[in-house]
Amino acid sequence: PYLLNLPPEK
C-alpha cells in the first residue's frame, strides 16, 4: 500500500 511508501514520521 501507499502507506508503506511513506517515510517514518518521527
UniProtKB/Swiss-Prot annotation:
Domain of life the protein comes from: Bacteria
Q: What induces it?
A: By elevated hydrostatic pressure.
Q: Supply any other comment.
A: On the 2D-gel the determined MW of this unknown protein is: 65 kDa.
Q: What is this protein called?
A: Unknown protein 8 from 2D-PAGE
Organism listed in the record: Fructilactobacillus sanfranciscensis
